[in-house]
Regions:
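Transmembrane alpha-helix boundary signature
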Residues: 1-13, 38, 58-68
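Membrane-interfacial loop-to-helix junctions in multi-pass transporters
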Residues: 18-22, 82-96, 122-135, 167-173, ...
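Hydrophobic mid-bilayer segments of alpha-helices in multi-pass membrane transport proteins
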Residues: 21-30, 41-73, 94-102, 257-265, ...
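Core transmembrane alpha-helical segments of multi-pass membrane transporters/permeases
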Residues: 33, 38, 48-63, 71, ...
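Transmembrane alpha-helix interface/packing and boundary motifs in multi-pass membrane proteins
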Residues: 36, 104-108, 139-148, 180-186, ...
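Hydrophobic transmembrane alpha-helices that form the pore/transport pathway of multi-pass ion
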Residues: 117-185, 204, 375-408, 417-434
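Long, contiguous bundles of hydrophobic transmembrane helices that form the permeation core
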Residues: 212-316, 419-511, 543, 547-553
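Long hydrophobic segments that form regular secondary structure
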Residues: 256-399, 406-407, 487, 496, ...
Length: 553
C-alpha cells in the first residue's frame, strides 16, 4: 500500500485519507507489538509515551508543552513521511547496519572468534595481571568485529571465567571485568554498533571519519580499564594463568588470514574512498575466499555455510531493525513538536552558559535515559535533546555527537540496570547487582574520557579530525595521566596501600586536569606534576614485596 503511489502518498501526509489512517495505525500498532516482544516492555513504553505526548501536548508543563496534534496528523507524520518510521534510523539499518552485521556473522562462522581468542591469550604473559589483562584484550579484539556489548560478553565469559577463577577473581569481579571489556565493543572499530552509522548519517560524514574519531577515545577506554586491572593485581596478588597459550607468531602464521578482510574493508573506505556498503560487501567476499586457507574444513565457507551465515545474520539483525524502526517514532516526535529545541533551551538555562555544566547535564540525561533504553536508542534521544545546546555553547558538532555516543555506551555499564554484567554473572555464578557494581568500578576511569575531548580546543585533537599534533600529544599525555591518577585513587595501591589523603589528592588532580584548560600553563600542568611527584615519592619510600590480600566482592 505504501509504495503503490508514493508521490501522492507523501503529499497526503498532513491530511490522510481514511485508508491511509487505517494502514498507518496498523503499522504503528504492529511495530509497537513487535518492539514489545523483541526489544522489551520498557523501551516500548517509552515510545508509547512519546506518542501520547504528541496527542496530549497541551496538558504538559509550559516549558515542554505544544499544541496537541490529532490522530490523523500523528499517523501522517509517522507513517507517510520520512520523519517517522521510515526516517533516518531505519534507513541506516537497511543501508549500512544490515551488511555489517552479516559481515560479523560471516567472520564468526569462518572461525574468526577463535583467532581473536588465541591472539589475546598469546599476549597475556605470565604475570599476576595477565588473567585480567587477557579478559580485557579478548573483549577488545573479539568485540570490534561483533559490535555488541552483550554478545561479546557472552562469547568471552565462558572462556575467561575459568582462567580468572584460578587467578583468584571472585565471581562478581570476573563478571564485572568481562562486562566492562565487552561493553567497550560498541566503541571499537570496525563495527561499533548501529549508533556509529547514525552518527555518520546525522552528521553527513564518511564512515571512515567516524572510525577515526572513535579510535583514540576507545583506546583510552581500554587503557583506563587496564590501569585498574594492573593495580588490582598488585593489590590482591593474583596468580598468573596456567594455560599453555600459543605464541603470537604461531597464531598469526596459522590464523592471521582473518585480518585480511578487515584490511580490505579499510582499503575500500580509505584508498578507494567507496561507501560503507561497498566496504562491507568487499569484506564479506574476502572472508569467504580466505576461509579456505583454514586447516579446519568446518570453517570453510561453502555454499551451505554461506546460507547459514546469511540466516544467522538476518536473525541477529532483527532486534536492531525493530529498535531503529521504533526509534524513528521518537525522532518523529522531536521533529514535529520541536521538543529537542525546548530541552536544549532548558539545558542552556540550567548550565548558565558553562560548557562543563552542560556536559555534566548531558551525562546525567544519558545515564537516566539509559536506565530503560538500549545504547542506540539512548544515543538517539541524547543527541536530539542535548547536541543543539552543546553546539550553541561552542562545542563542534562532531564532538557533541561523539559525547552523546560515549555517554550512551557508559549508561550500559551503570547500575542499577546493566545487561552485560547480568549476562556475565549468569555464567560466573555471581550476584547480578554486585557484578554491576564491579563493572561500574572498572569503568570509572573511562567516565573521564568524554571530558578529555570536549572541554577544551586542545582536547578536540583527540578526535584527530581537528587540532595539530602538538595538541594531540599534550592531550593524550594529560588524558593518560588522569586515567592513572583515578585508577590509583580507586584501587588505593601501588607497591603498598596508599594513604587515603594521597588517594583523594590524586583523584582531585585528575578532575582538575579535566576542568582546567589543557595546555602549557600553570592551571593545566600543576595538577599533572603534583600527581606525578606523589607517585614518584611513593615509589621511592616504599620497598619490599607487596602485602598479600584476599580478593573481595
Amino acid at each position: 500500500y505504501t509504495f503503490t503511489d508514493m508521490d501522492q502518498f507523501i503529499r497526503r501526509s498532513t491530511v490522510p485519507e481514511p485508508l491511509d489512517l487505517f494502514f498507518g495505525l496498523m503499522a504503528i500498532l504492529l511495530l509497537l507489538e513487535i518492539s514489545r516482544r523483541i526489544v522489551g516492555n520498557t523501551f516500548t513504553a517509552v515510545v508509547l509515551g512519546f506518542l501520547l505526548y504528541m496527542y496530549f501536548g497541551n496538558y504538559f508543563p509550559d516549558v515542554i508543552s505544544h499544541k496537541s496534534y490529532d490522530l490523523g496528523r500523528i499517523v501522517g507524520h509517522m507513517y507517510m513521511t520520512l520523519e517517522g518510521i521510515f526516517g533516518v534510523p531505519l534507513s541506516v539499518s537497511v543501508s549500512f547496519v544490515m551488511l555489517f552485521v552479516v559481515y560479523g556473522t560471516f567472520m564468526d562462522v569462518a572461525g574468526a572468534g577463535g583467532f581473536w581468542l588465541d591472539l589475546s591469550l598469546a599476549t597475556m604473559g605470565r604475570q599476576s595481571a595477565s588473567a585480567g589483562r587477557g579478559a580485557v584484550i579478548t573483549s577488545a579484539l573479539l568485540g570490534g568485529p561483533q559490535g555488541s556489548g552483550v554478545a561479546t560478553t557472552m562469547s568471552v565469559t565462558p572462556i575467561m571465567w575459568p582462567i580468572l577463577k584460578k587467578a583468584g577473581y571472585s565471581p562478581n569481579m570476573a563478571a564485572g571485568l568481562i562486562a566492562t571489556g565487552g561493553i567497550g565493543a560498541v566503541l571499537s572499530p570496525p563495527l561499533m554498533g548501529a549508533a556509529a552509522f547514525l552518527i555518520m548519517q546525522f552528521m553527513g560524514v564518511s564512515f571512515w571519519d567516524v572510525i577515526v574519531m572513535v579510535t583514540v577515545p576507545t583506546i583510552l577506554y581500554y587503557v583506563g580499564t587496564l590501569f585498574m586491572v594492573e593495580l588490582e593485581a598488585r593489590k590482591y596478588r593474583f596468580a598468573p594463568p596456567e594455560t599453555e597459550a600459543k605464541t603470537v607468531r604461531q597464531v598469526m602464521l596459522s590464523q592471521g588470514y582473518h585480518l585480511l578482510s578487515i584490511a580490505v574493508l579499510v582499503a575500500i573506505l580509505v584508498v578507494w574512498n567507496k561507501s560503507p556498503e561497498y566496504a562491507a560487501l568487499g569484506a564479506i567476499g574476502t572472508t569467504v575466499l580466505t576461509s579456505f586457507l583454514s586447516k579446519d574444513r568446518n570453517e570453510w565457507l561453502t555454499p551451505r555455510k554461506i546460507i547459514t551465515a546469511m540466516i544467522e545474520g538476518a536473525k541477529n539483525m532483527l532486534p536492531v531493525a525493530v529498535l531503529l524502526a521504533a526509534a524513528g517514532l521518537i525522532v518523529g516526535t522531536f521533529t514535529l513538536t520541536g521538543l529537542g529545541l525546548k530541552i536544549s533551551s532548558i539545558i542552556m538555562y540550567a548550565s548558565g552558559g558553562s560548557v562543563l555544566a552542560a556536559i555534566l547535564l548531558a551525562m546525567i540525561a544519558s545515564m537516566l535515559i539509559g536506565l530503560s533504553l538500549p545504547i542506540t536508542a539512548t544515543y538517539i534521544m541524547t543527541v536530539v535533546m542535548v547536541a543543539p545546546a552543546l553546539v550553541k555553547l561552542g562545542i563542534p558538532m562532531h564532538v557533541a555527537h561523539l559525547l552523546a555516543f560515549y555517554f550512551a555506551v557508559l549508561s550500559e555499564v551503570s547500575p542499577p540496570v546493566g545487561l552485560s554484567p547480568c549476562a556475565a554473572a549468569a555464567v560466573t555464578g555471581g550476584n547480578p547487582f554486585g557484578s554491576m557494581m564491579q563493572a561500574w568500578k572498572y569503568s570509572l576511569p573511562a567516565f573521564l574520557v568524554p571530558f578529555f575531548f570536549s572541554t577544551t580546543t586542545v582536547g578536540y585533537s583527540l578526535l584527530i579530525l581537528g587540532g595539530n599534533w602538538l595538541d594531540f600529544i599534550l592531550a593524550t599525555m594529560t588524558s593518560l595521566c588522569s586515567l592513572l591518577f583515578v585508577a590509583l585513587g580507586i584501587i588505593g595501591y601501588l607497591r603498598k596501600k596508599l594513604p587515603m589523603v594521597e588517594r583523594v589528592l590524586l583523584i582531585i588532580a585528575a578532575f582538575v586536569m579535566v576542568i582546567s584548560p589543557i595546555g602549557w600553563s600553570i592551571p593545566g600542568l600543576a595538577p599533572l606534576f603534583a600527581g606525578i611527584l606523589m607517585i614518584l615519592h611513593h615509589l621511592r619510600v616504599t620497598r619490599g614485596p607487596a602485602r598479600k590480600s584476599e580478593a573481595s566482592v
